[in-house]
């Protein structure tokens, strides 16, 4: 029986660590002569070594010990690399365990393959200095710091047999998102979920500053982490001979505590919130590298952060220092002359899927299943009479989502995430069948819908956490959505960017399996935030995402409940997209039949016959609308215009899939010029009522024939005011739209009508200041058929 704590076994762990360190340094500097089997020459060294050293050795040490723990306890474990610029760690270790070569056969486990491995790192046409999608075993690149623990938690939800070993950088730990993510202990259910083992890598320094937590005493850190629901286990030192047994003991203690917690929950029915173990690992930044340079410390200093020895192919003055450093790992003990890891060391790596780099969870998930969807048509609102029914789109969606939860109860592969906004965003019906997952004490009747098990995670007021959990969940093959206030999606728009970048690069890797899409619902929108005011009014996430590569971005603006149902049916079946859905939560008139809604979503837009008077002829004007309030105001404007100018030929177009309007030169899905002209004509005025910033629509029309465009969107005007006044403030109301159309079509002949519209706006302004509510003409307006 193997003694995993014996000196002999730990000596092999040390050898594996040294091999990983050697491979990691080689990737920084060399492009040839990988085993230094001849004197180092300028041609062997990169012109410009790029990369980072400071975090590498400590992480390689942890990786080797996690391998030991996997072997000892037969664990299902994967690795999340939180510290920035640690790209060599997962590359080096996957190369040593063989998984890298299985994916990239040209990077063979011999001298020639090692040469290619070294050269490609941070090299044109090569691989990144992060744990990018090209890296086996990675679900987290770690370019933008702060999300490692959120991703790890998202991954282990509903994966009860999995442990996420999340190494948290001590610089990363200073970010807001990471600091918030320690509260994740409140949400991990040990019965149904896996476990996260956070390992705080306290190497002491960032780019040029000390790290805050590294200067705290063990007592202070213990209080901090215990208050967040974690029991820290400390390991500290710089002597490998002492650090190996200490780290092995710490790992054993942590794993056995996790297993005891899970056993108590699964076999004994313990529903209390556990105190999960974590490891605080204090080892020097740049450990095992050069101690000093030019009389100042390198190891255990910020100076170890990047390239510690100044050597490149044009300056070989200090080549001996690099050679001495690399040979300090005694490569002749680690590799054969042919460049293969010696068998007794290679045997230390876990086998098959037990290798962290080959764990299926990191490549699209463990046995991923498609979402079972009920027929969205069964939840449709009867809109036989357009605008007669008043409903709340998100309430209706909640009925559909409620049944998605029921239909997927057995698979446990669907969750809803949010920052304390699920009820505010009117997803009330989901609580007919589930609860909020919450492991803290529950105090009824003061609390509502709280339980130790539930499909909703919305009880932490952190957009970063909700987004990070969802990312971890979908990157491991499951499904869900994140619903939040539209303006506060800007809090996580950089996270959305990072997820997009992951999707794009992962899609280029033939070996990467597909991911379910990341679905984001923006509600409590800019034109519905009259009660919360200017701070809550920002539709800019539309513009932000539209700037990304179009293959991975979808933006939907359903105008009513039926269109929202058809939209969500589409996005839940999609893969490798970021789907942004702008949805209304307030009572609104309902417009489209479920068949119309289906066509709207399928085609992206539709000429609405019942709201048009062009009778398939060339119109005098095109009125287009994208969004709930833009659609309402456009229809009201059409009513006003038709009453005043019954002979005016108006074409009304509703737009749901906004980016489909773009030219095929920009977006492969875009309408051809012929199709676009069929909708919008080549030269007739287009008055476009838009939910977002106007520049996005102008950009869409730039490559088209028709530049006779007049956009009425959000003009950065807002306040605490009435609902209709929000539209008036931005001239996206029925009166300003009607005035625009009349002037565009009739010119000076529309002067009297334009004045009447200005008079209505003036009347509105006075009325709301007198009465505090909108005009009866607005509040009581109903659609009447045009013919």
Curated annotation (Swiss-Prot):
Domain of life: Bacteria
Stored SUPFAM superfamilies: Thiamin diphosphate-binding fold (THDP-binding)
EC number: 4.1.2.-
S-S bridge residues: none
Keyword Plastid: no
Cofactor: thiamine diphosphate
GO biological process terms on file: carbohydrate metabolic process
Enzyme class: lyase
PROSITE patterns to which the protein is assigned, alphabetical: PHOSPHOKETOLASE_1, PHOSPHOKETOLASE_2
Keywords associated with the record: Lyase, Thiamine pyrophosphate
GO molecular function, one term: aldehyde-lyase activity
PANTHER family attached to this UniProt entry: PHOSPHOKETOLASE-RELATED
Similarity comment: family membership: Belongs to the XFP family.
Protein name according to UniProt: Probable phosphoketolase
Species whose genome carries this gene: Latilactobacillus sakei subsp. sakei (strain 23K) (Lactobacillus sakei subsp. sakei)
